[in-house]
């Protein structure tokens, strides 16, 4: 799998449960990569694949 997950807009890509791509924003997985967020962060749990340390969380700011 391409580590950059560079699929075309509206295309598909194979997003694993644990995020190994750098910019995965594909309709096929309906998730985007973000830093790991605190357990209580519903937004991150619903829309992100965990990547990075929790102290660098950006999707729940």
Curated annotation (Swiss-Prot):
Protein task: Metallothioneins have a high content of cysteine residues that bind various heavy metals; these proteins are transcriptionally regulated by both heavy metals and glucocorticoids.
Assembly, per entry: Monomer.
Keywords in alphabetical order: Acetylation, Metal-binding, Metal-thiolate cluster, Phosphoprotein
Residues at which a divalent metal cation 5 binds: 34, 36-37, 50
Residues that coordinate or bind a divalent metal cation 6: 37, 41, 44, 60
Binding site for a divalent metal cation 7: 50, 57, 59-60
Annotated a divalent metal cation 3 binding sites: 15, 19, 24, 29
Binding residues annotated for a divalent metal cation 2, in chain numbering: 7, 13, 15, 26
Residue ranges of coiled coil: none
Region (Alpha): 30-61
Native species: Bos taurus
Family: Belongs to the metallothionein superfamily. Type 1 family.
Protein name listed in UniProt: Metallothionein-1A
A cellular component term, taken from the record's GO annotations: nucleus
Lineage start: Eukaryota, Metazoa, Chordata, Craniata, Vertebrata
């Amino acid at each position: 799998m391409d580590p950059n997950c560079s699929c075309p807009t509206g295309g598909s890509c194979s997003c694993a449960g644990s995020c190994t791509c750098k910019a995965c924003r594909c309709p096929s997985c309906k998730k985007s990569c973000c830093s790991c967020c605190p357990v209580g962060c519903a937004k991150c749990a619903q829309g992100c694949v965990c990547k990075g340390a929790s102290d660098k969380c950006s999707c729940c700011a």
